[in-house]
Regions:
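A short, structured loop/turn motif at beta-sheet edges
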Residues: 47-48, 95-101, 126-135
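A conserved amphipathic terminal alpha-helix motif
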Residues: 17-22, 142-182
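Hydrophobic/aromatic beta-strand elements that line small-molecule binding cavities or substrate pockets
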Residues: 41, 91-96, 121-128
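Short beta-edge strand/loop motif at the mouth of beta-sheet-based domains
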Residues: 38-39, 58-91, 177-182
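Hydrophobic pocket/interface hotspot
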Residues: 50-51, 60, 79, 94, ...
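Extreme N-terminal basic, low-complexity initiation segments
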Residues: 1-10
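Hydrophobic ligand-binding cavity/cleft-lining segments
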Residues: 13-70
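Beta-strand/loop substructures that line and gate deep hydrophobic ligand-binding cavities in soluble
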Residues: 112-158, 175
């Protein structure tokens, strides 16, 4: 909170290449290039309500521009993001399911051939109680330098999470339409 007592959202977006430390600088086979988008916000709600909002397909459609996030919601189960018309835009697998703290999805774009060719990314959603709010951290990573997918999601996550925050706090979304370019 700032001095005025208002909750503030911090929106860091990191599109830089990150290389793990190498024991031998000449051994490049052990290095992995990575692109990452991180979005952090604070939502005035409970961890349980936020968790439900992230995993209930009917609720996701309200803030995710009509798209439903569908799964059996257990580790190893398939996951997909589906339009109201039934088109699967993204799909993958639930890697980790730890309600109401951590959700990890192996994520692959199905709509755009160029983004699909980049392969599988990992989306991690972490929920942490913070006073009367919940800190939500969305981290989307792909093992690829200069990923166009990460550029795309770095434009999408702020819109989706802004709608989620607004819906949970006020009962309505702030953005009605979203032109998905990926």
């Amino acid at each position: 909170m700032d001095r005025s007592g208002l909750l503030q959202a911090r929106v860091p977006v990191d599109l830089t290449m990150q290389l793990p430390r190498q024991s031998n600088p000449t051994d490049l086979e052990d290095s992995v290039a990575r692109s990452t988008c991180v979005y952090v916000t604070y939502i005035r709600t409970t961890p349980e309500k936020l968790w439900s909002a992230l995993t209930d397909p009917e609720f996701t459609a309200q803030y995710w521009f009509g798209m439903r996030s569908e799964s059996q919601w257990e580790a190893g189960s398939p996951w997909k993001l589906v339009t109201g018309e039934g088109e699967v835009l993204d799909s993958g697998e639930i890697v980790e399911f730890d309600p109401p703290r951590r959700l990890v999805i192996r994520w692959e774009n199905q709509r755009n051939p160029e983004l699909k060719a980049e392969g599988v990314s990992l989306c991690t959603m972490e929920l942490e109680p913070h006073g009367m709010a919940v800190k939500l951290t969305v981290t989307h990573t792909i093992e690829r330098d200069g990923s166009k997918l990460i550029v795309a999601v770095s434009g999408g996550w702020p819109k989706v999470v802004s709608n989620l925050k607004s819906l949970l706090e006020t009962g309505s979304v702030v953005l009605q339409d979203y032109e998905r370019k990926h």
